[in-house]
């Protein structure tokens, strides 16, 4: 039996804005009581603000038991992992990740319009979406092991951990629930 309820709320901004939005939302008594027993996931990328490590500390120390689902450096890092393994020893700068997206999508510019387009994720996943998602999850696990072996931890070392994604845990859980419910 599964009881997953997803209620996405868009904070429209960087990690600090996501945190502030969640804190303000949960300060309201009606929201605090309604979501008391819910898992509260904060989904963000780590390219902004510059003090991302301090923001992560605030999130962890808030008392609202947030689960942090991040993509470092960009959300596109996670998307690229669906069609290519990323390695920490290589160039994983914003410029490189955006170029990989541009090349894969066969566009001359990777604009906000393309980024927000409903078809973009479909183009990345193609007809074998489940395989690509599972491959991205495995890539994320390899990166996680790499950083663990180096003694790095998101709570204190996120700025040194590029690329790294933790959102895979939420995605994997959702996929497993779908498989469980659908057989």
Label the model's feature ranges.
Residues 15-19:
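Eukaryotic endosomal/vacuolar membrane-trafficking regulators centered on PX-domain-mediated PI3P pathways
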Residues 2-9, 23, 28-183:
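C-terminal accessory helical subdomains adjacent to catalytic cores in phosphodiester-
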């Amino acid at each position: 039996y599964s009881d997953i309820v997803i209620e996405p709320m868009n904070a429209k901004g960087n990690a600090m804005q996501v945190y502030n939005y969640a804190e303000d939302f949960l300060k309201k008594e009606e929201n605090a009581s309604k979501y008391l027993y819910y898992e509260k996931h904060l989904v963000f990328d780590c390219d902004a603000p510059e003090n991302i490590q301090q923001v992560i500390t605030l999130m962890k120390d808030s008392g609202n038991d947030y689960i942090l689902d991040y993509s470092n450096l960009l959300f596109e890092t996670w998307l690229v992992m669906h069609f290519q393994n990323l390695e920490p020893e290589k160039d994983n700068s914003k410029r490189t990740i955006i170029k990989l997206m541009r090349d894969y999508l066969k566009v001359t510019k990777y604009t906000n319009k393309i980024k927000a387009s409903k078809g973009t994720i479909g183009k990345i996943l193609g007809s074998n979406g489940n395989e690509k998602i599972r491959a991205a999850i495995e890539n994320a696990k390899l990166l996680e092991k790499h950083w663990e072996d180096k003694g790095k931890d998101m709570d204190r070392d996120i700025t040194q951990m590029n690329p790294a994604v933790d959102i895979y845990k939420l995605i994997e859980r959702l996929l497993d629930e779908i498989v469980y419910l659908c057989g």
